[in-house]
Amino acid sequence: MMVIAICGPTLMLMSAAMSAAADDVDLSPVIERHEMVPMRDGVKISVWTYTPPGDGPWPVVFEQRYADLRGAGTRKAAAELAGHGFVVALVNYRGTWDSEGTWVGYRTIGWGELQDGHDVCEWLATQPWSTGKVGTLGSSQGGYAQNFLAVTQPPHLVCQYMTDTGLSLFHEGYRIGGTTRPERFKSLATNCRNPADNLALLQEWDQHPDYDEYWRQEDCSLHFDKMNVPCFTIGSWYDFMNQGSIDSFVGRQHRGGANSRGQQQLIIGPWLHGRLNKGNHVGELVYPENAAWPEVPHMVRWFNHFLKEEDNGVDREPAVRYYVMGAVGEAGAPGNEWRTADDWPPAAEMTPMYFGAESTLRAAAPTAETSVSTYTSDPHRPMSIPGTAFPGATDARAFEAQSEVRTFTTDPLTTPVEWTGRIRAELFVSSTARDTDFIVRVSDVYPDGRSILIVDYPWRARYREGFDHEALLEPGEVTKIAFDVGWLSQVFNTGHRIRVTVASTGAPLYEPNPQTGGPQTIDALADGVVATNTIHHDRQHASRILAPLPVH
């Protein structure tokens, strides 16, 4: 393993379109054009192209998204990339903004009867200004779109570059950990030509609460063997979709097609979802300058190599680069450095840390015959986690002080402790309700008392046996719920403490569980019931987390 230094400016190329008017933006000498491109069923999709000056032809890079493409920031970023010798194309999904048709989510960009991404890719490849070599880029839903596109195997698709991506809308989007997220997706109506299309889509999702064939039709992880192009993937430690970014890299690297296996690269840094452009500013922390990543210069090198056959060495760089986070603002603190690896994850020994009486978190298993932590969960008065996305490195004490929340904390550390890998929770719980949620959070507690959040994840109790079927709780009966909390690479410094937090609500980030055990619909919360939930941490029911301690 080698420690490396990475620094430089960052720019999230297509992350958040500014609201400036479409006119009065000087893009010269790049030429901007608008096309309505027919799909295989005759519906026309809106495509904006940005062409470099000169005679061409040029390779093409394109992004699919549902957001407005006319913001000044988006157009300037597209023109900037075009200035490096590419035709840049921005594409709106079917039924959004200027694109015709009905918005049905990702159903028309995948491997079904309609394959809009595939059709756009091939149209771009056959234009007179195109060399026939096409690459893609995009963040978040633009990453989903790239995975969907790769499965359809367009003949002219050569490479991809994705940030904070996902593979399965069920697992990483609408039903994270089995919990529902309608409020987050209701807002997509603002992008639709017909806003009613989005409500109809959410109602359709309600008819499929479990992971069934409907959702498998939008799960790219089932089709890695069809993905057959090199891809550079950017993941973020403080991203609720980081699981998707990592799974995408691992799946393509080991189970992809012949041109995919061994040609993937991954970088994971201390960033928020879609906020790589903020550099080293994450939540309430300011990491050292080395936490920044020069995304656009690196992206240009990636596309220059694969689309222009430039031997610039980008294909020979480490398969994995990851940032080991450490204490911020403490001189000489370990961590806050980049490392490389040949694969993911690095070797680790899963080490148990047990919950105990008096809110302790210890390596020793409990010996008490009876030991519990009990709280009341009211879906109509949920605990508060502000926002609709993971808040990142923020002080969690306000959340931890709320009545429903239970914390388990180590003694101050006498030596630094590193966790690199995926944390797993194993909870023994009981409830007076037929269904409830458990949100597990991990924080780094600084000597001044700040509890800086690192990672969290929810789990709906009815899915403790798997997402393909429901298993409601028997009130009062102790049951085990085990799930992965998430990935991290963190050095907890001497004098710090490690804290695990458990709660059953955290809105609006996570939609409250009605706790009735009934159907999971948009309006189910109206019938919600109060539950008494208990975490057991005795000799026979040893609730714990498994921490990934590196094996050097």
Q: What is each stretch, according to the model?
A:
Residues 207-266, 419, 491:
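Serine-hydrolase catalytic core
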Residues 63, 115, 122-191, 206-207, ...:
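Primarily recognizes the serine-hydrolase "nucleophile elbow" in alpha/beta-hydrolase
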Residues 52-125, 167-168, 173-175, 277-286, ...:
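Cap/lid segment of the alpha/beta-hydrolase catalytic domain
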Residues 137, 161-164, 234, 267-270, ...:
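Alpha/beta-hydrolase-fold catalytic nucleophile elbow
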Residues 1-16:
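Bacterial N-terminal signal peptides
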Residues 281-552:
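C-terminal, loop-rich substrate-recognition/catalytic regions characterized by aromatic stacking residues
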Residues 90, 146, 159, 260-289:
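Catalytic cores of eukaryotic secretory-pathway lumenal/extracellular enzymes that build
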Residues 22-54, 409-415:
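N-terminal cap/lid segment of alpha/beta-hydrolase-fold proteins
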